[in-house]
Structures are given as structure tokens and as C-alpha cells.
A protein has these predicted regions:
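Ligand/cofactor pocket segment of small-molecule handling proteins
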Residues: 1
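C-terminal cap of thioredoxin/glutaredoxin-like
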Residues: 5-11, 22-26, 102, 106-210
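Structural alpha/beta surface segment adjacent to cysteine/selenocysteine redox centers
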Residues: 17-103
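Short, cysteine/histidine-rich loop/knuckle motifs that typically chelate Zn2+
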Residues: 14
């Protein structure tokens, strides 16, 4: 069994492509792959978001606005995950499509519409997105990122605990690189950056990922 943790900026086009690559690999590979899309929110993510939108990095008002919006989208995603991984993943992908492709602005109405389209129990969802459990899940994700030394979105950590006693960190990867690593045709000691950590060391942290 392989475990893939993909750390994402929910509102970055590159991360959308990364998600597609992981989903494609899980479908194509003969190996059993368990994967998580872990939202990342830090100053690097915020500044890259501003840069991609052509906004000055010293525009503190816009930086704060982007930070709050990303935080809200992440809490929405975590709340959707409480109703199942597939529903949560579908919600995230639908929100990304609405905001990045259709250029819709984040709003309560958009969140409700997307949740309903993804067959999410709306009453439960609206309560959970403002609850402590969603905030705790967000904080757990950020701790996991810190423990794995993740500072940038579009980073994936791959564990094959049946064979190896370490995790492999891939940054800004493509489908071919990820597939080669998972299928064993890429030597992690020579071809990719390696994050030396035992599977046991992350056992507790893995439990935090929902």
C-alpha cells in the first residue's frame, strides 16, 4: 500500500493539475494507493497567490483578504470531508472549477450551491464549517506540513511503508515523475529530493489527516 500526501493551495491552477495527476495515478496504477489532499496555508502560499494574480506583495489589505478567503475555502473543504472523503474531494474540485475556471467570486451562495451539487447534507455542512472540529482539522494539517518540512504547495510526500523506511518528497512534479516513483522505476536515492523519516515517526501525524 502506498500513501500519497499532496499539499495544495486550494485556489492554485497548478495544484488542480497536481490533484488530477494523483487521481489519474490512483486509477491507472496496479498498486493500492491511498491519497490525501492536504490544504496548506502559510505566507509562501499567500504571496504566490498574490503574484499569480498580479497583485503587489506589499498590498497588505489584499494579502489579508486573500488569506481570509483561502482560510474559509479550507474550512469549507474540511467540513465537506466530514461527510466522506469522496464528497469532500468532489466539493474541493467543484469549488476550484467554479472559482478558477468560471471566475466566480467566493460567497456564501456559491458555497451552498456547490455543497448541494455535491450531495452534501447542507444543514450539517453549514454547522461544521463554522465549528471547532473544522478549525482543529485545519491546524492538524498545518502541523503535518511542518513535521514533513513542507513550505510550498504542489508538494507530494510518498510513503511505501511495506518496502522502505522513509518518505520521498516531490516538489513541482509532473505525472511521469510521480508514476515512475510509484512504479519503482525512479530511484529516490539518486533522482529526487529525499525526506529521511521513518514511517513510524509519522504514524501519529497521519492520523490527523482526514
Amino acid at each position: 500500500v502506498l500513501e500519497v500526501y499532496l499539499f495544495v493551495n486550494p485556489l492554485a491552477n497548478q495544484c488542480v493539475q497536481d490533484e488530477k495527476n494523483v487521481l489519474r495515478l490512483a486509477n491507472d496504477s496496479d498498486k493500492q494507493i491511498q491519497f490525501q489532499f492536504v490544504p496548506l496555508l502559510n505566507i509562501n502560499v499567500i504571496q504566490r497567490t498574490l503574484k499569480n494574480q498580479g497583485i503587489q506583495l506589499n498590498d497588505w489589505q489584499e494579502q489579508n483578504r486573500q488569506s481570509q478567503m483561502l482560510y474559509r475555502v479550507i474550512l469549507d473543504y474540511k467540513a465537506a470531508l466530514f461527510q466522506g472523503k469522496k464528497r469532500g474531494r468532489n466539493f474541493l474540485i467543484a469549488m476550484q472549477s467554479a472559482m478558477l475556471k468560471a471566475k466566480q467570486h467566493y460567497s456564501e451562495e456559491l458555497v451552498r450551491d456547490v455543497a448541494e451539487a455535491c450531495k452534501i447534507d447542507l444543514d450539517m455542512f453549514m454547522e461544521d464549517r463554522d465549528g471547532q472540529l473544522a478549525k482543529q482539522a485545519f491546524q492538524a494539517d498545518q502541523r503535518l506540513a511542518s513535521e514533513m518540512n513542507i513550505t510550498e504547495a504542489s508538494s507530494a510526500v510518498v510513503f511505501d511503508c511495506d518496502q522502505y523506511d522513509y518518505g520521498v518528497l516531490l516538489e513541482h512534479f509532473n505525472y511521469a515523475t510521480l508514476a515512475d516513483l510509484v512504479n519503482g522505476t525512479l530511484d529516490p536515492f539518486h533522482n529526487v529530493p529525499r525526506h529521511a523519516a521513518s514511517c513510524e515517526a509519522f504514524q501519529a501525524a497521519q492520523l490527523h489527516v482526514l
